[in-house]
Design a protein with these regions (language model features):
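Non-catalytic connector elements of ABC transporters
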Residues: 263-332
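ABC transporter nucleotide-binding domain
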Residues: 187-280
Length: 332
């Protein structure tokens, strides 16, 4: 495939139109009728726990895996019938860096550029530009085996941008990164969209979806169980969010049971901070909860009422506590 800078599509045009995608692996249906519509010039988040079908969906959209049923169009081009055209319109960055750790950052980018058809001089120029963009200039000649995980991830993203694709698939690009590096990646993703790209991002980090995505699809067991803007999804579970901490950590499970009993909702516990959060339709029910705590001898350390969180959205939609172990509820 020869290198060519692609014209960015008009904002508002459909970048992705996927209908009824199905993929089976033996007796396991990994993706079960997924529909996704992503507008050009936006960041679209696909949120779900490990094993929900996010990566399989991305692979089908990116022509890396053929769907058993359903159809996908990328900027109007069918991914099966026009796969060669589609591949020139997209870039893909996965959870695991696709760079060669035996080479330097510069050597990796030059090789990728040459494979895309750039001449020697143009390939080196592109490598220098990308290393500067991703704050890797000082490490340009260093062997990748000495890179941190965050540096390798940034280099992988840089490699996917050599051809400046109109559509970029990012499959959990910040998994395993420290908070500082994750924030740097977020800023890079925002700049990409500002410059005209479209980003489809899969993640298991709730805060990441909240920070970046214009719209979010929640996937569970291979199906899209909810879709909308962040505010639309938050509004779907209630008007408020109860946040509270208990003085005695040993009482946290009793407190959780009282919250669910009084408010008639499911709650989430953050063990590391001893915090309980739950959606709440009627703020007046706080009084009933305080009475229940007093009668049970449970002492509060802190209580507040805020806007609903994506944590509560996911738990409310799936209604399945087992997802708490595989979906990252931590505040990155």
């Amino acid at each position: 495939m020869s290198y060519e800078r692609r014209k960015m599509p008009n904002k508002g045009e459909w970048a992705v139109e996927a209908q009824g995608l199905i993929k089976n692996f033996g007796d396991n249906r990994a993706v079960d009728g997924v529909n996704l519509n992503v507008r050009a010039g936006s960041i679209y988040g696909v949120l779900g726990p490990n094993g929900a079908g996010k990566t399989t969906t991305i692979r089908m959209l990116a022509t890396l895996l053929r769907a058993d049923a359903g159809s996908t169009r990328i900027f109007g081009h069918d991914v099966v019938k026009e796969s060669q055209i589609v591949r020139q319109l997209i870039g893909v960055t996965g959870q695991y860096a696709s760079v060669d750790e035996s080479l330097s950052a510069t050597e990796n980018l030059v090789i990728f550029s040459r494979l895309l058809g750039l001449g020697r001089a143009e390939a080196r120029k592109k490598a220098v530009e990308l290393l500067e963009e991703f704050d890797l200039t000082e490490a340009a000649k260093r062997p990748l085996k000495n890179f941190s995980g965050g540096m390798r991830r940034r280099l992988d993203l840089a490699a996917s941008l050599i051809a400046q694709p109109p559509l970029l698939f990012l499959d959990e690009p910040t998994t395993g990164l420290d908070p500082r590096t994750r924030n740097q990646m977020w800023e890079t993703i925002r700049r990409l969209v500002t410059s005209g790209s479209t980003v489809l991002l899969t993640t298991q980090y709730l805060q990441e979806a909240d920070e970046l995505a214009d719209r979010i699809a929640v996937i569970d067991h291979g199906r899209v169980v909810a879709e909308g803007t962040v505010n639309e999804l938050k509004s779907s579970v209630g008007t408020s969010s109860l946040q509270l901490s208990i003085q005695d950590p040993k009482e946290i499970e009793n407190a959780r049971q009282k919250v669910e009993e009084v408010l008639k909702v499911r709650s989430i516990v953050y063990p590391e901070g001893g915090k309980i959060t739950a959606p709440m339709e009627d703020a007046d029910r706080v009084t009933d909860l305080l009475i229940a705590f007093r009668q049970s001898g449970i002492q509060l350390a802190e209580l507040s009422v805020q806007k609903p969180t994506l944590d509560e959205v996911f738990l409310s939609i799936t209604g399945d506590n087992k997802n708490e172990s595989s979906l990252n509820f931590s505040k990155q």
